[in-house]
Amino acid sequence: MGGWLIMGIYGLIQQFIERIQTLHHLLPLLPEERVYIRFECENENVIFAISKNGTEEEKTVDEKRLLTIRGSEEAIETLLTGELKLQQQMRLEELSVAGSFRHMLLLESIFHLAKPYRFVR
């Protein structure tokens, strides 16, 4: 960990978005309609949308299709770099998630399949 924090959560989210866009095996998993993901931590609040039509940062959201992930910068970093899974961090109470269970499972799958190769086990 540690070294990633220099980049900040925003930079890690940008890298995650780029991975989603370049990993073509993820396309069948992506929803037809946009699903919005909000990351909230002490210093940052970033929202982006994922769908088959693309993945990008957003300013406005459809609250019914929003999944909010809250936690410390370190916990969000651990999720975005693939060191721990979303549900593992929820059990450890490092992250909390608000939104539909279906969207949470979808995002858990995308995080797992899009994690950087150095963390693939």
Predicted regions and their residues:
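Feature captures hydrophobic
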Residues: G2-R121
